[in-house]
Regions:
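Short active-site segment of divalent metal-dependent hydrolases/proteases
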Residues: 109-110, 182
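Conserved short loop/turn motifs at secondary-structure junctions
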Residues: 104-105, 122, 293
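Amphipathic alpha-helical interaction segments
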Residues: 92, 111-115, 314
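Post-HEXXH active-site segment of zinc metalloproteases
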Residues: 97, 101, 112-127, 193-197
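Short alpha-helix carrying the canonical HExxH Zn2+-binding catalytic motif
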Residues: 100-105, 177-178
Length: 330
């Protein structure tokens, strides 16, 4: 028996009947099976080794192009989502490999400057959602247009991890919560370290139930979700847990994400993305030929794909190159 087959047998024995099983996963293009790795393990590895994943290390989480060494980036956020997700998946006997693959891919489509860049592209293009772009990357853009040929279960989880969308697997539903838990807790941790907020400013119920440290907050929310989702058909917290999560989120939007100290950089980041898009729409010959080919000649789509894939610093330097005067040695 192959190692992969043994792993698939172990899944059937050890995982919940409600879990997604690797052996049942489907791809749009069928492939020869790997002797060692399951389909979900291969998906995780393909994402991890992709160019789009590597670029996440230089993309904004909250603070645009931060100079400190310890602030979160889009990559560290992704890794924290994967860790929280795997912890909950193991407790619930769900498929950890599927959870990890979804986590690794869920933010591949994020723009430079985070949600500010996403809104900027939405403003100029009429429609742009980072979760949809994540799926476009793994289907159409990676591997010179061949994509990564991920399983439908992984792509479904990537697409449906945000907003009111609902994934078709429990693992996908789990990542939606893991994402929220991760970003609220680590963004609070970063904001406190920056001096933007202090623990005493947290809403009373948030402070009482979740505590005031990054660790205690994650622990409380993970325990709530696991206790309430055990052997259930949905992933959920209890009523109080969801209320506290929303209260914490509202606090973070008011005091951190939309706070006065971050507004100047948010406006600058938005402006950089808008002006780069306008530049390439007026100078389509300057777009990489590969990008135009992948977009099948649609210049707006090519510009959107190209700009959304830029890192923060690359976007800033590109903006300077296109719009700022150059110094000449005379």
């Amino acid at each position: 028996m192959l190692i992969r087959e043994r792993t698939e047998e172990l899944e059937k024995k050890l995982l919940s009947p409600k879990a997604a099983f690797s052996a049942d996963a489907k791809r749009s293009r069928e492939e020869t099976e790997d002797p060692m790795r399951t389909k979900f393990q291969r998906d995780r590895d393909r994402i991890l080794h992709s160019n789009s994943f590597r670029r996440l290390k230089h993309k904004t989480q909250v603070y645009i192009a931060p100079e400190g060494d310890h602030y979160r980036t889009r990559m560290t956020h992704t890794l924290e989502v994967a860790q929280i997700g795997r912890t909950m998946a193991r407790a619930l006997r769900l498929n950890e490999d599927l959870v990890e693959a979804i986590a690794m891919g869920h933010d591949l489509g994020h723009t430079p400057f985070g949600h500010v860049g996403e809104q900027a592209l939405r403003d100029v293009c009429g429609h742009f959602e980072h979760n949809e772009q994540s799926v476009r990357i793994v289907e159409c853009l990676e591997n010179d247009g061949r994509g990564l040929n991920l399983t439908e279960e992984v792509k479904d989880g990537m697409l449906n991890h945000s907003g009111n969308l609902k994934a078709h697997t429990l693992e996908g539903g789990l990542i939606k919560y893991a994402d929220r838990i991760a970003y609220l807790c680590h963004d609070y941790d970063d904001a406190e370290n920056m001096g933007l907020i202090s623990a005493k400013e947290l809403p009373d119920r948030v402070r009482r139930v979740l505590g005031t440290t990054h660790s205690s907050m994650i622990t409380a929310m993970v325990q709530n979700l696991v206790e309430n989702s055990m052997d259930e058909d949905t992933i959920h917290m209890d009523k109080e847990g969801d209320e506290i999560l929303l209260e914490f989120r509202s606090f973070m939007f008011d005091r951190v994400y939309m706070s006065q100290p971050l507004i100047p950089d948010r406006k600058r980041g938005h402006g950089v993305v808008v002006m780069l898009y306008e530049w390439y729409m007026n100078h389509p010959d300057e777009l990489p030929e590969k990008q135009k080919k992948l977009a099948q000649g649609n210049i707006s789509l090519a510009a959107r794909d190209y700009i959304s894939g830029l890192t923060d610093n690359f976007a800033i330097n590109l903006f300077k190159e296109k719009y700022m005067p150059k110094y000449w040695n005379l």
